[in-house]
Amino acid sequence: MINKKIQQWLGVMILCTALLCSKDIQAQDAADSTRLYMIDEVVVTGTRNATDVRHLSQAVSVVNRKKIEQSMQPSLLPVLTENVPGLFTTARGIMGYGVSGGAAGGISLRGLSGGTARMMVLIDGHPQYAGIFGHPIADAYQSLLADKVEVLRGPASVLYGSNAMGGVINIVTRKMHEDGVHTNLHAGYGSYNTVETELTNMVRKGRFSSVISGSYNRTDGHRDDMGFEQYGGYAKLGYDITDNWNMYADMNVTHFNASYPGPVSAPLVDGDQHITRGVSSFAVTNNYEKTSGSASFFYNWGNHWINDGYTPSAGETSQDGRFNSRDNMMGVSLFQSTQFFKGNRITFGFDWFRYGGKAWTNYVAGEREGTRNDLVDKHEDEIAGYMDFRQDIGKWLTLNAGLRVDNHSRIGTEWIPQTGLAFHLPHAIELKVSASKGFRYPILREMYMFPPQNPDLKPESMWNYEIALSQTLLNGRLNYGVNVFYIDGKNLIMTLPNPNGSGMLNQNSGKIDNAGVELMAAYRINANWSVDANYSFLHMKNPVIAAPEHKLYAGGSFTKGRWSVSSGIQYIGGLYTSVGDNPVTENFVLWNLRGQFSATKWL
């Protein structure tokens, strides 16, 4: 229930909006005829059909292929951290993130973390996370996959269900847009025997298209026992059945070997991980003037082998057991979006997801050598239907509303609503207000694995209230925006003393009370020069680790002929590294300088 303060705040927003809209309605038609919108504002995240972002009431950031290539990073996460306000990812070295103890690659969006399954990564709209642990695998999200990345900041549970509670990162995979053959090789060598390679071939001929990519990356790391090695490939085949119907199939497989050396004060030995992740999908899409839709199937899987290592300085010896897991997630997604009359768009969709796996410990030494201890072997199902409604009212207002009914095989049914208004004002000003609910079901680890497990956990839920203002100036060369949000969440799962016995127990006892401001601006000075900046402030009543209070980025790029140079500086302030009675925060500054020369069309 919205408390009195939030009701008053929303009332003021709506009143201000009404005053702005009524100021000069007659003059708006003239303003509309001269307004210019950038083509990269057409998105598929936050809506199931390609939509001008102006008509959405939620905040969506787009990082295009040019930005990804300029970053010269094998992983997508660094470029997203730079370009998306409110999003922060942890890192631990030159390359690679790893899993389990000492892992980095934790993704936080407005204080909600993917590590706790409160935000989701998608590939072409399909959920991507470990079936048992429910979190994204950071090393699986490589730059070679992406044509662009869209980040929806705020709940996206109406369209994507559980785990999209705090937002989603949607990786839109690459494709060839015109006939021809394009081959690109990226190779680099640097300190600590660091090697980066990527080879991509894209083809389009008539109705057929293909993308084939492969990569190999490695480093010794800046510390002993911190090596990282990764290799993988991606393939996508597409065929235009008719002018209106298309089908494609794709597969991505990556394997990485990572080592964790422990803290400098107490080095760890044999902290090794061997991880393989795979993603595959098949989709048939249709696209007509007044209707579009898709039917798709996806299957994700992972094999994990982990040695947690030991600390000699603490008198420890090599561990007897090795952790193993096999997880998977599959699903079917159907939707059709239709325009029934002018300015209207209604989408009906259906999702079925099945996820889970098994985990066990293999004992390779000690008294239990040659035996196995099973930890979990479970699968759960989700089935959901949803409706997303959008209606233009005149030229100055778009109404958005949505509802999802989601059923979990063990927990039951959740109703997830959202609503919002987008006002298209004179002088290319956009004003948006929204209220949306996010939720997540307990993951298998919380319900069934390790001593704190609790099979009676309930879903977490939250409401996000937001107002956003943006404007485009100078014939589209300058744009800026500001977002203000408030998050009110309940039933967060926490590990606390068992109220009915000894030990610890996972319980629905936590709350979220976050508020923040996000600012962004970009200016295309001329054909060669461009600059951009973003800043986010986050206030958390209950702070969490790896969620900074202040995040600032400012950068610029210069392109001329075959040369391209870009640079950016990032400031992180109030980054929590420890919470509780004695919280600890850190600040740091990171400066990047990148240069690129295209020797040929393919190198």
Q: Where do the PLM segments sit?
A:
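Extracytoplasmic beta-strand/coil segments of soluble accessory domains associated
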Residues: 80-126
